[in-house]
UniProtKB/Swiss-Prot annotation:
GO CC term, one of those recorded: cytosolic small ribosomal subunit
Protein keywords: Ribonucleoprotein, Ribosomal protein
Keyword Cytoplasm in annotation: no
Native organism: Picosynechococcus sp. (strain ATCC 27264 / PCC 7002 / PR-6) (Agmenellum quadruplicatum)
Annotated stretches, region: Disordered: 229-256
Recorded family membership: Belongs to the universal ribosomal protein uS2 family.
Identification of the protein by name: Small ribosomal subunit protein uS2
GO molecular function: structural constituent of ribosome
InterPro entries documented for this protein: Ribosomal_uS2, Ribosomal_uS2_bac/mit/plastid, Ribosomal_uS2_CS, Ribosomal_uS2_flav_dom_sf
Pfam family, one: Ribosomal_S2
Gene Ontology biological process terms, A to Z: translation
């Protein structure tokens, strides 16, 4: 069994890109065709690149490497948090703070402040503070949990960063490039593959697409830590036939 099948990718809408007028020509090698003014991503390549990313992240996890997931768009935020927690990775799903990685020593002081406030609350000492002071401290705690809760236990900059929506997370990409941190990224048809190390051509707007791909990457991290391998000798069949069959079904349902 492959890590991900063409059927799974099709059912999750991974193949739907953006309107053809919004494309980045550098994504041309990963585009299969266009239908009704929308680019269709070549899912054979997507499946193969998911395999590569899975193997890479599984081996990294086996060697004790740490992964940071970054996805601040509404469709990705909940998935990022859920999957990162499941596999023991870190995550940023609200807003990328400038210098999150390049100014890590400063960010780390805010993380320590978060831990300090959480300890204060858990001990009951926060509730015993004067009402006004307690209110201010709780507001500070809420804000720190919102933006830094996903990296609370991150002791150093990550070894790998996974990006959802390369265009939106351009600041994170720039910081990773500056520090030489490998980037694994979902790339829609309006993205630039030259800015990442391991591209995964995929619809980065649909919840099901994001959940499928991020879930597979989380599986890799989990397998690397817990020794649960996946048989990755995949047979992807005939994508031409699969996409034509899917398109025929879609056209038929739209004409009804």
């Amino acid at each position: 069994m492959p890590v991900v099948s063409l059927a799974e990718l099709l059912e999750s809408g991974v193949h739907f890109g953006h309107q053809t007028r919004r494309w980045n020509p550098r994504m041309a090698p990963y585009i299969y065709t266009s239908r009704n003014g929308v680019h269709i991503i070549d899912l054979v390549q997507t499946a193969q690149l998911v395999e590569q990313a899975y193997t890479y992240m599984k081996e990294a996890s086996e060697n004790g490497k740490h992964v940071l997931f970054v996805g601040t768009k509404r469709q990705a935020a909940g998935i990022i948090a859920q999957e990162a927690k499941r596999c023991g990775a870190f995550y940023i799903n609200q807003r990328w703070l400038g210098g999150m990685l390049t100014n890590w020593e400063t960010i780390k002081t805010r993380v320590e402040r978060l831990k300090e406030l959480e300890a204060l609350e858990e001990s009951g000492n926060l509730a015993r503070r004067p009402k006004k002071e307690a209110s201010m401290l709780r507001r500070e705690l809420d804000k720190l949990q919102k933006y830094l809760g996903g990296i609370k236990n991150m002791r150093k900059i990550p070894d790998i960063v996974v990006i959802i929506d390369q265009r939106r997370e351009h600041n994170a990409i720039q910081e990773c490039q500056k520090l030489g941190i490998p980037i694994v990224s979902l790339l829609d048809t309006n993205c630039d593959p030259q800015t990442v190390d391991l591209p995964i051509p995929a619809n980065d707007d649909a919840i099901r697409s994001i959940k499928l791909i991020v879930g597979k990457l989380a599986d890799a991290i989990y397998a690397g830590r817990h020794g649960q391998p996946v048989d990755d000798n995949g047979d992807y069949g005939d994508f031409d036939e699969a996409i034509d069959e899917y398109a025929d079904e879609t056209d038929a349902s739209e004409s009804e």
